[in-house]
Amino acid sequence: MENIIKIKNIKLGESAPKICVPVIEKTEKEIIKYIKYINKLPIDIIEWRADFYLEDIIYNEESEINIIEISKSIKKITNKPIIFTMRSYKEGGKLKSDFYNNIIDIYKTVIKNKCFDLIDLEILTLKERDIKNLIKLAKENNIKTIISNHDFNKTPSKKHIVYIINKMIKLKCDIPKVAYMPKNKKD
């Protein structure tokens, strides 16, 4: 892992924290409209939470083609770095666990088509071999990787957090990310 990650004109790990705005709209029209709006704001990064878009869609090859087309539309609007995220239900997102194989296929399609600048992979949702394969594919296509873990019900023990972050680093992601819900001052 490097200390400074350069994505387009943004350097993560250098100077001031960066502002990232999520896009949680459900239709292509709403997604494009919102990105046009936030692109005018003083933000650094856009995160497309595709789990909101995919929540009510029956997955098929057309879904992948739509994601590619949406990414092309987004790139016409903004030059800001874009994170592609499909957050699982258990980590605060909209995707159910029965969508697993589709998640892997969509990530592969997004990576091979160089649709986005970064992808966010959940360490406790995806199988380790799938994470390794996706990271390898992402590196081959010059796409940065975030490995994340979220728990919005509690903060795990310090030992568990250190274990998770070390595992993320061992998997050779570009950016390890954890987000937990503090319940008391100790957290």
Regions picked out by a protein language model, each given a short descriptive name:
Residues 74, 82-121, 128:
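Glycine/small-residue-rich loop that forms an oxyanion/phosphate-binding "nest" at active or ligand-binding sites
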Residues 33-53, 116:
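Catalytic domains of carbohydrate-active enzymes, especially glycoside hydrolases
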